[in-house]
Each structure stands twice: as structure tokens, then as C-alpha cells.
Amino acid sequence: MVERIEDLNLPNAVIGRLIKEALPESASVSKEARAAIARAASVFAIFVTSSSTALAHKQNHKTITAKDILQTLTELDFESFVPSLTQDLEVYRKVVKEKKESKASKKDSNTAENANASATATAEEAPE
């Protein structure tokens, strides 16, 4: 499990990138502020995860789903997050589906190419 409380923090690079994206370019953030934001984000993530785990357990689920997270956010009075998260979730699912289809398509075309190459090689080897 977790040995130190610092192990629960989100990566500093991720936090730094999020801060940079959220603020104007002219804004600067001290190291202490970055550390505080990182800790707050980690605590929030743990809180939502813990609450979602309890919700899933109540519903006899072993796995937390996106639906559990969204419902938990609503119950915790963070319902203003739900519309944008739902939209982001739809985009994520679409990207995953497209990648999966692309991978399957690539695999099918490779299989077809291998079959064609094999048939060509067999035809070339056949005695006349």
C-alpha cells in the first residue's frame, strides 16, 4: 500500500501542465502554491475515489465505473463538473473506439496482405 503520504500526490509535471493551461501566460505560480495545488488535487481525487468505491459497494459492484464517479460528484455537490466530464468521457470513448477499429483494420489488412503474398508465392512455386 502507501508508505508515505507524499506517495499519494499526483505527478508534479502533470500538475504544472494543468496550472499552465488554466492560467494566462503572464501568470506565475510559486513552488509552495504548486505544492498546495498538487496536494489539494490529490486529496480531491482520493475523496471522490473513496466515495465512489462506497457507492459501488452499496450497489454490489466490485468495479468503480464512470457512472459511479459522475453520480458521486453530484452527491458531493460537484454537479457543475458533470456536464463537462460527461462530454470529455464521450470524446475519450470515441477516441478509444477509433483506435480499436484502426488497429483491427490494420490487422485485417495485414492478414489479407499475408494471404495474398502466400498465394502469390505458392503460385510461383507451382510447376508448370
Swiss-Prot record:
Localisation: Nucleus
Keywords, sorted A to Z: Nucleus
Low complexity composition-biased segments: 111-128
Chain positions covered by the region annotation Disordered: 98-128
GO molecular function: chromatin DNA binding; protein heterodimerization activity
CC per GO annotation: ATAC complex; CHRAC; epsilon DNA polymerase complex
Function description: Accessory component of the DNA polymerase epsilon complex. Participates in DNA repair and in chromosomal DNA replication. Histone-like protein which promotes nucleosome sliding of ATP-dependent nucleosome remodeling complexes. Part of the chromatin-accessibility complex (CHRAC) which uses energy/ATP to increase the general accessibility of DNA in chromatin. As a heterodimer with Chrac-16, binds DNA and facilitates nucleosome sliding by Acf. Has a role in DNA damage response by preventing cid mislocalization to chromatin.
Subunit structure: Homodimer. Component of the DNA polymerase epsilon complex consisting of four subunits: the catalytic subunit PolE1/DNApol-epsilon255 and the accessory subunits PolE2/DNApol-epsilon58, Chrac-14/DNApolE3 and PolE4. Component of the chromatin accessibility complex (CHRAC), composed of Chrac-14, Chrac-16, Acf and Iswi. Forms an heterodimer with Chrac-16. The Chrac-14/Chrac-16 heterodimer interacts with Acf (via N-terminus). Interacts directly with Iswi and this interaction is further stabilized by association with Chrac-16.
Entries under PANTHER family matching the protein: DNA POLYMERASE EPSILON SUBUNIT 3
Name assigned to this protein: DNA polymerase epsilon subunit 3
Species for this entry: Drosophila melanogaster
Gene this chain is encoded by: Chrac-14
